[in-house]
Amino acid sequence: MKTPKALGRPPRTKASANGDSTREQLLAVAETVFAKHGFAGASFRTLGSAAGLSNAAILYYFPSKKKLYAAVLARVEESFRAGLIALDFSGEPPERVRRIVDYQLAWGRQNPAYVQIMMRDLVENRDRIPYARKMAMEESMSIIRRAYLDLHATGRLGDIDPTMLQYVVSGAIIYFQVAFPTVSRLVGSPDWHDLERNFTATIHAMLRCCIGGS
């Protein structure tokens, strides 16, 4: 039996399905373009050329570049948050923080374009921050901050500020994943897997030192 909500919903047409497909295609292309050029460097001409759409077609789905960029940032947040909230948050605070770190590393490895978008947004959004109604990744960072605050509440961080530790670790992960080619060249290690293993081990060793060797 159809629910009242279903009865009140207009039937899905072929045109609306095609529109959804075009919108998704545009968003997928926009992810690549924004990852490469950032918000400031991505023009409608570049976006349209990559997507095979006219400026008018892009404006049909997104009335401005800001709206398109906001939709891309929302997809980045949704992707990261979906995996984050699926983590097992049982156990002691140190173990919860370790799981979060492992997830951040794995997510970044699987979503390199999203990591590039995040890094570019951090660099470019300084002037927009005072006027932003909602910051990118705000919900996810709040979830992570809670884990670090719980860790601090155990007394094992001493004088270390839990929020600053969160951003030191998260920032190091993002920078490493974005700057891998440069880091690889500087340290003379072209093997991504070997370099990532060393980086992961270093992050966890640093956390153990902060937590008191746990």
Task: Locate predicted features.
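C-terminal peripheral helix-coil segments that are non-catalytic and often amphipathic
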Residues: 1-10, 106, 110, 138-154, ...
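Helix-turn-helix
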Residues: 22-25, 29, 33-67, 71
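Solvent-exposed, non-membrane alpha-helical residues enriched in polar/charged side chains
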Residues: 23, 31, 35, 70, ...
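Amphipathic, non-transmembrane alpha-helical scaffold segments
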Residues: 27, 69, 73, 77, ...
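Amphipathic alpha-helical linker/stalk segments
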Residues: 70-99, 147
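Hydrophobic alpha-helical connector segments
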Residues: 85-116, 154, 162-169, 200
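Amphipathic alpha-helical segments used for helix-helix packing
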Residues: 109-131, 179-187
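A contiguous binding-surface segment within folded domains or other stable secondary-structure elements
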Residues: 119-149
